[in-house]
UniProtKB/Swiss-Prot annotation:
It comes from Nicotiana tabacum (Common tobacco). This is 14-3-3-like protein B. GO terms for cellular component: cytoplasm. One of its GO terms (biological process) is protein localization. Belongs to the 14-3-3 family.
Length: 255
């Protein structure tokens, strides 16, 4: 199947909300690239949307099951807890496979072939995101390894973003948003999370008048999410996370 046809099929799968198939079509596009070829902005966004939906459904399932597990444990329902743990393991296996799939794709072809600054940041941010999703449910040495890989990818992305992308660039802002969520949720460092989010927000505000019309909506939306998280984190550091922490859903369509 030609590249254009796979892209069209991916769009069709998105409309039908068949995201596993959308992933498959975009993987075919990604692996068929020549050594000097890159995904277009549209193609990389389609890949991101596909994986975000596939992983998002499992992340939501895992959170619900984990919450039920805690309740059953507190009630002393050991039989129920055993059933829940087995079911949670099944979801975790799916999460691992999805993350492994995109991380292999990023390391084998997408990151090495990226030439423009925004492409490099986009893919390194994506690498950080999927290691972070692993860190959300892994434990012990595996969690530590996932967290270290997340930090390494986000820092590499941040270095390029600070050097090559404007403070108002939606990809740079999206990176700051997700990096700050990593500090808060995975490393339990609310101070670092707040500092990173505030710096990104302040730097973008200072250059808001230079923002082009095409990315104005995306950039201001992520800035709002940064501010929402800052408000949440600073108002009550003791909050148990009852309110939803905001992170980027896709890079061209913040939700």
């Amino acid at each position: 199947m030609a590249r254009e046809e796979n892209v069209y099929m991916a769009k069709l799968a998105e409309q039908a909300e068949r995201y596993e198939e959308m992933v498959s079509f975009m993987e075919k596009v990604s692996t068929s690239l020549g050594t000097s070829e890159e995904l277009t902005v549209e193609e990389r966004n389609l890949l991101s949307v596909a994986y975000k939906n596939v992983i998002g459904a499992r992340r939501a399932s895992w959170r619900i099951i984990s919450s039920i597990e805690q309740k059953e444990e507190s009630r002393g329902n050991e039989d129920h807890v055993k059933c829940i743990q087995e079911y949670r393991s099944k979801i975790e296996s799916e999460l691992s496979n999805i993350c492994d799939g995109i991380l292999k794709l990023l390391d084998s072809c997408l990151i090495p072939s990226a030439s423009a600054g925004d492409s490099k940041v986009f893919y390194l941010k994506m690498k950080g995101d999927y290691h972070r999703y692993l860190a959300e449910f892994k434990t012990g040495a595996e969690r530590k390894e996932a967290a270290e890989s997340t930090l390494s990818a986000y820092k590499a992305a941040q270095d390029i973003a600070n050097a090559e992308l404007a403070p108002t660039h939606p990809i740079r802002l999206g990176l700051a948003l997700n990096f700050s969520v990593f500090y808060y949720e995975i490393l339990n460092s609310p101070d670092r999370a707040c500092n990173l989010a505030k710096q990104a927000f302040d730097e973008a505000i200072a250059e808001l008048d230079t923002l082009g019309e095409e990315s104005y909506k995306d950039s201001t939306l992520i800035m709002q999410l940064l501010r929402d998280n800052l408000t949440l984190w600073t108002s009550d550091m003791q909050d148990d996370g009852a309110d939803e922490i905001k992170e980027t859903k896709t890079d061209n369509e913040q939700q």
